[in-house]
Design a protein with these regions (language model features):
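C-terminal interaction-tip segments
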Residues: 7-35, 39, 96-119
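Beta-strand signatures of extracellular beta-sandwich domains
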Residues: 53-57, 106-108
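Short edge-strand/loop segments of extracellular domains
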Residues: 57-61, 112-114
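A generic structural signal for short beta-strands and their flanking turns/coil linkers
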Residues: 36-38, 50-52, 89-91
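Short solvent-exposed strand-capping/beta-turn motif centered on an Asx-Ser/Thr pair
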Residues: 42-47, 98
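Short conserved beta-strand and strand-loop elements enriched in small hydrophobics
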Residues: 55-57, 93-96
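Short, Lys/Arg-enriched N-terminal segments with co-localized hydrophobic residues
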Residues: 1-6
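Intrinsically disordered, low-complexity Pro/Gly/Ser/Thr-rich segments with frequent PxxP/GP/PP motifs
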Residues: 59-92
Length: 119
């Protein structure tokens, strides 16, 4: 038997409408997976603008800021990432809006999961 490890790639997007100013989990990297986060798109549909904080929490519960109180202009979608972000198994992307019922967030990622194939 010959064992080979190949990578299964799956594209996903996660969306949230921030209806409160509480911190909300947007995405958790699944077990045995690495995620390449290509985009975090934020928009404010209130006509007034708002702020957003986006963090990554690792498996040791350490919190890292991706965007801190970033101002999002009214009716102008804003791309948060300038480069892809690699996140590992169990890491969590969380978001919090400064104002409720104004902000929408869309995260787009490619999940990479190793898979063993027997031939």
């Amino acid at each position: 038997f010959l064992f080979r490890i190949i990578m299964a790639n799956v594209f996903v997007n996660k969306k949230v409408d921030l209806t409160s100013d509480a911190t909300t989990t947007l995405y958790t990297v699944p077990s045995a997976t690495t995620a390449i986060i290509k985009s975090i798109l934020v928009s404010d549909d209130s006509g007034s603008g708002s702020g957003i904080t986006i963090t990554l929490t690792n498996t040791s519960d350490a919190v890292f800021s991706i965007a801190f109180q970033k101002v999002i202009q009214a009716n102008e979608p804003t791309e948060i990432l300038t480069n892809p972000l690699v996140a590992e198994t169990g890491e969590i992307i969380k978001v919090a809006a400064a104002n409720a019922n104004r902000v929408h967030v869309i995260l787009s990622a490619m999940q990479v999961t190793p898979r063993t194939v027997t031939t």
